[in-house]
Amino acid sequence: MKSHLWIEEKHGDFLGMAYKVEEVLFSGKSKFQSVDVVQTKGHGKMLLNDGLVMVTERDEFVYHDMIAHVPLFVHPSPKNVLIIGGGDGGVRGVSCVRAFFLQCERAVV
């Protein structure tokens, strides 16, 4: 069944984004927050925490590259890394041999 749901996110008084939801893939509440995974028309799968967009298939690389590359570039040989948060798994660097995740929110892993 097609969804008539739109996700709207406002940023200040003059800027916002709207996403057409094709299907709700998961919706639940955890100990810490609400967690939703939806299929959108233009951005693919989207993860929302408490109704706020965390990451989308279309542009996740922008988010993950920004938070991963700086620490990876300052270390001469990043083989073993600890990732705090990052339950979606997108931060793990290609150069890493072993990655350890510390994620308190089981619902987003």
Predicted regions and their residues:
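The AdoMet/dcAdoMet-binding core of the Class I SAM-like
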Residues: 1-6, 10, 30, 43, ...
